UniProtKB/Swiss-Prot annotation:
Keywords: Mitochondrion. The keyword Mitochondrion applies. This is Protein dml-1. It comes from Neurospora crassa (strain ATCC 24698 / 74-OR23-1A / CBS 708.71 / DSM 1257 / FGSC 987). InterPro entries: DML1/Misato, DML1/Misato_tubulin, Misato_II_tubulin-like, Tubulin/FtsZ_GTPase_sf.
Length: 540
């Protein structure tokens, strides 16, 4: 079945994953004559609930600190009786003293879901934890609370790379985390295609993730692993983080990148950029908002790994190979463009008109099909939103620049969803297939496109961050067309060199030389001797 197992590490990643799972849940169809576009067996596991009914739950393991799960209990309506009387899973088997803290009350949204009522609209004030907008039941085995650290503690902050490393090492020595938490999900899979890891890169979760990936790679040497590494540049900008704390986060990232790079098939550092198109309006201080935008891009670009359509389906290993076409280039950049769902009036016009130009204009309003974009931009497609972190100690707005600011693209995959298939698209797809069989120069960009008519859903759990042409928020319950991309390009070279220079002075002599050499070696993999613009002209 080519199953994918997910690892969720920390509060920020759990916000992201909650948006991801809510979207997956919305793709279920309940009519026998309606086949879903997505193969749900890839991300969901069958089971038997407490009352003997069949269940379907995510193949995921969720780690968070004490207090990070909010009002979500380890058990739920499907498994509560089965687990009653059992000790909740937590990484501690020593003597216990019962201390009851006041329970975190459920949000009104969760109360309405449990009662089968229409939930009230969510706001940044009512979303306190990722569990406040969660629409999915998880198996009790999926929920792992780490009691050694408390969420948002000022006394023992979970903010340093070494802290995460040490926590994993101590817990793994005592409990064997992989064997206890991850292996049961892997062993129940028929033919696992890979593991996706959602983690922070610039805090202690980076150290935790690096050690976890090392263990996984030792046990499952050939398994494809995608790492989605979030950075909190936008939250730091909104909160005015001190220069010292920003330097700490960059040092954490440098350490995480050099370690994760050794084990992951693809590493995607991402953050919400300082500059966004006018069609996106969000609260930069809200994790709910920030991760919603990132989730729309990530959920879209990974669709080929779970689509039923064989013409637009590939495994994680195949996707990784296509991105890493020229050596050890496994650090990728994430991009996205979107357009609102066509109105009913526009759909009528689209279906009824024979005017090619009018149809083309309406289709362009709905963004562009990936195959057409690849045909028109054989050296790489640059989308409206670039999630690549700047890695700057002092915040610099990324220029939206012209062609001179665009780095050389080595390889790129694009996924489009929701666009009309017309003659232009068919011709572009055929041209792409012909190009794939042509003998290539190592200096040519490797391009691959995927498409599905399945639009990205705007659920009632998703914030209204997208705007229409008049600036009004898009209504919940609708859907949008999305084009999302993963690219390996020459900009990584300069960013890693800059990161090396910035953090070098903040790291002790013992580690400075080794870390500097590893960053330089990584950077050299992305230096091909030229880019479409001068290095001096880049901001990042």
């Amino acid at each position: 079945m080519h199953e994918i197992i997910t690892l969720q590490l920390g509060q920020q990643s759990n916000y992201l994953a909650t948006h991801f799972w809510n979207a997956q849940e919305s793709y279920f169809t309940y009519s026998e004559d309606q086949e879903p576009a997505v193969n749900h067996d890839i991300h969901w596991r069958p089971g038997i609930g407490a009352d003997g009914t069949e269940t379907y739950m995510p193949r995921t393991v969720i780690y968070d600190l004490k207090g990070g799960f909010g009002s979500m209990a380890k058990t739920n309506a499907l498994y509560n009786d089965l687990e009653e009387g059992q000790t909740p899973q937590a990484l501690w088997n020593g003597p216990t003293v019962l201390q009851k803290q006041p329970a975190i009350p459920q949000s009104a949204y969760q109360q309405s879901l449990d009662a089968g009522l229409e939930p009230p609209p969510l706001t940044t004030d009512t979303v306190r934890y990722w569990s406040d907008f969660n629409r999915v039941f998880y198996h009790p085995r999926s929920v792992v609370q780490l009691n050694e650290y408390e969420l948002n503690s000022s006394i023992m902050p979970f903010e340093r790379y070494a802290t995460g490393e040490d926590l994993f090492a101590s817990l793994d020595k005592e409990h064997d985390l992989l064997d206890r938490d991850l292996r049961p999900f892997i062993e129940e899979a028929d033919q696992m295609q890979g593991i996706q890891v959602m983690t922070g890169l610039d805090d202690a979760w980076g150290g935790f993730a690096a050690k976890y990936l090392e263990r996984i790679r030792d046990e499952y040497g050939k398994t494809a692993m995608f790492v989605w590494g979030s950075e909190q540049e936008s939250v730091m900008r909104a909160g005015g983080l001190s220069r010292e704390k920003r330097l700490l986060r960059l040092a954490n990232k440098a350490r995480t990148m050099t370690e994760v790079y050794k084990y992951a098939s693809v590493v995607v550092p991402f953050t919400v950029p300082a500059t966004l198109p006018g069609s996106v309006v969000l609260d930069a201080g809200s994790q709910w908002h920030n991760t919603a935008l990132s989730a729309a891009a990530i959920e879209s670009v990974t669709l080929p790994s779970r689509l039923r359509d064989p013409a637009n389906r590939d495994t994680m290993a195949t996707l990784a190979d296509s991105l890493n076409a020229m050596g050890k280039q496994n650090v990728a950049s994430l991009g996205m463009s979107f357009a609102p769902e066509p109105t009913e009036e526009e759909d009528v016009v689209m279906e009824g008109t024979q005017d090619f130009r009018q149809r083309q204009l309406l289709n362009q309003k709905s963004s562009r099909h990936a195959a057409v974009m690849v045909k028109e931009n054989p050296e790489g497609v640059f989308l409206d939103i670039n999630f690549t972190p700047t890695d700057q100690l002092d915040y610099v707005r990324r220029r939206g620049g012209g062609d001179d600011d665009r780095p050389r693209v080595f390889s790129q995959m694009l996924t489009s969803r929701g666009y009309e298939i017309d003659e232009q698209v068919q011709e572009a797809k055929e041209a792409e297939e012909d190009e794939r069989f042509r003998r290539r120069s190592s200096y040519e960009t490797v391009m691959k496109s995927y498409h599905t008519p399945l639009r990205f859903p705007l659920l009632d759990s998703f914030p209204q961050i997208f705007r229409d042409d008049s600036g009004e928020p898009l209504k919940r319950g609708g859907a949008i067309n999305v084009t999302s991309s993963l690219s390996t390009d020459a900009s990584v070279h300069k960013r890693l060199k800059s990161l090396r220079t910035t953090v070098g002075r903040s790291i002790g002599l013992e580690d400075r030389e080794q870390l500097g050499n590893e960053l330089a070696e990584m950077a050299d993999e992305y230096h091909e001797g030229w880019s479409s613009g001068s290095d001096d002209g880049d901001d990042d």
